[in-house]
Amino acid sequence: MKLALVLSLIVSVAAAPTATLANGDTITGLNAIINEAFLGIPFAQPPVGNLRFKPPVPYSASLNGQKFTSYGPSCMQMNPLGNWDSSLPKAAINSLMQSKLFQAVLPNGEDCLTINVVRPSGTKPGANLPVMVWIFGGGFEVGGSSLFPPAQMITASVLMGKPIIHVSMNYRVASWGFLAGPDIKAEGSGNAGLHDQRLGLQWVADNIAGFGGDPSKVTIFGESAGSMSVMCQLLWNDGDNTYNGKPLFRAAIMQSGAMVPSDPVDGPYGTQIYDQVVASAGCGSASDKLACLRSISNDKLFQATSDTPGALAYPSLRLSFLPRPDGTFITDDMFKLVRDGKCANVPVIIGDQNDEGTVFALSSLNVTTDAQARQYFKESFIHASDAEIDTLMAAYPSDITQGSPFDTGIFNAITPQFKRIAAVLGDLAFTLPRRYFLNHFQGGTKYSFLSKQLSGLPVIGTHHANDIVWQDFLVSHSSAVYNNAFIAFANDLDPNKAGLLVNWPKYTSSSQSGNNLLQINALGLYTGKDNFRTAGYDALFTNPSSFFV
């Protein structure tokens, strides 16, 4: 109690930090002893009414004299169970997400496009600190910037003598940010959530100097959907990462996500989901279906959106809402853009967890036979030929000793097909697109990592998103990667400047003779080769578009 009282007095006595924006407005933040935070700054007009689903419009009203001391609400979320076969859990979660309690703990709404800047205490304009811009994950269905506190990373940067400024932003998810279909393409409104991120990066370029940051030293980083979003920003406008003639960012870090294996915005599955949302919203007979969707209440749109499959429903990573090639900003199939060199030329770090697919395979426990697994893959990958499905199933057999969690032998096979499906989902969505990117990226220096830290954890192993724990909440030996090495990369473009106990090798190709991966296990860090599951790589990525969704 005494310590808490002393700390509260220090906070109250310390002068509130200020920053001056590019337009001359001065704003006030929160002094939190070890850092100073400016939270919930609007960077776009509220995307409501006629702006629903559209790319964002920059915020233009004066902020002069305003205080920004708490996070803004997250953007609207969908129920991640989506159209679960059993109505009870879906209905219960729908009710919870719309309850006053949920809104009090995790507020969300359409007026949500805000940005947060957190800096070490005492940072002044002219400090020119490197800037790390975080893009959150959540399957393009849920999430918000307030869920990822940056204090651990900022503290680590100060202790290293390599202080950074941490920026995070909200962006629209689910139908609000990634609705697809021909009507969306015709209007030019595809990938609104990516546009939100881009406008946030432009806000950083315009304003971060007033907080003590260096706009020429920006690193973008993210996990899961955030990592895929980083990739989309690398591919934006065929790799043009400039704004007002200068780069928006000089480096990128991707944690569990690379190119999105998705059809165009007017492709069959995106159109199917659009039609489903339209019908559920009661707009099926409207002459202008988009106008109808813009006119309905937010609660009604939430219900219609949550009538589509969610990440935790049976179709799993065949997500209803994804970044998709729109012919304008994501100009083509993302794998082709990387092959053709249409990717920003910046240094990158990209890595994965060893068992990325286990959590997502829990929604398909009713698949127990080879025949059912084949049907599951046929339904998931509608472009794949019978021969390609045969090759996939041969590369990922039902032999439980070969599935995920990997290297666990006969254990963790909660159904005869669970480990097989977990292996396919993890490799298709996360692990092997990383290898494809590294083999084809023609840009800057490349580093890659793979974690096996939780290999002894039953059923889910070193599962998707466990890195967030060691990055933002708890310190372990892997924090040397997720904090220290990333901070060194943002400062010096070299993760080895963090003083790791092993040298992190540069990656040239998956076939290079030396080690090319930094690996993490339960005991520490070591290096190894990116040469596992080559048959799976060939099955999935000899013709990547066969497995697009």
From Swiss-Prot:
Residues 1-15 form the signal peptide. Pfam families: COesterase. Glycans are attached at residue 366. The keyword Chaperone does not apply. One of its GO terms (biological process) is lipid catabolic process. Disulfide bonds join 75-112, 283-292. Its EC number is 3.1.1.3. Keywords: Disulfide bond, Glycoprotein, Hydrolase, Lipid degradation, Lipid metabolism, Signal. Belongs to the type-B carboxylesterase/lipase family. This is Lipase 4. The gene is LIP4.
